[in-house]
A protein has these predicted regions:
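Glycine-rich phosphate-binding loops that contact phosphosugars or nucleotide phosphates
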Residues: 11-17, 21-113
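A short, well-structured juxtamembrane/interface segment
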Residues: 1-8
Length: 113
């Protein structure tokens, strides 16, 4: 998915709060260093103007250890309205918001790569 989006000039946006945000920043930096267009945007920044960056076909990866983050729950709806591909990384398999995402990576004990 990432390679396909990259070859079509699309961007991967990564978002998460707290420690998940730290992981997201690191991941965006690592992907950029190997030539994949990636950028970290904090969840609250999306609702304060950053949604304008998104183009149809872009991907947003949402990272949350618990999956119980109200800001991320609101964002998923905004991304879906704009036809944005969503990927979730979560440590909690039972979170209902994961069902709304296009792809999910679940890691029980530890989320961090």
């Amino acid at each position: 998915m990432l390679i396909s989006n990259h070859s079509h000039g699309r961007t991967l946006y990564i978002t998460g709060e707290g420690k998940s945000g730290i992981v997201g920043k690191r991941l965006a930096s690592s992907l950029t260093s190997i030539g994949i267009s990636a950028q970290f945007i904090a969840p609250m920044d999306w609702v304060h103007g950053e949604l304008g960056h998104l183009k149809e076909g872009d991907t947003v990866m949402m990272i949350s250890h618990s999956g119980k983050n109200q800001t991320l729950e609101r964002l998923i709806r905004l991304f879906k309205e704009r036809k944005i591909v969503t990927i979730g990384m979560c440590g909690n398999k039972k979170v209902k918001v994961l069902k709304e995402m296009d792809a999910v990576r679940y890691r029980k004990r530890s989320l961090y790569i």
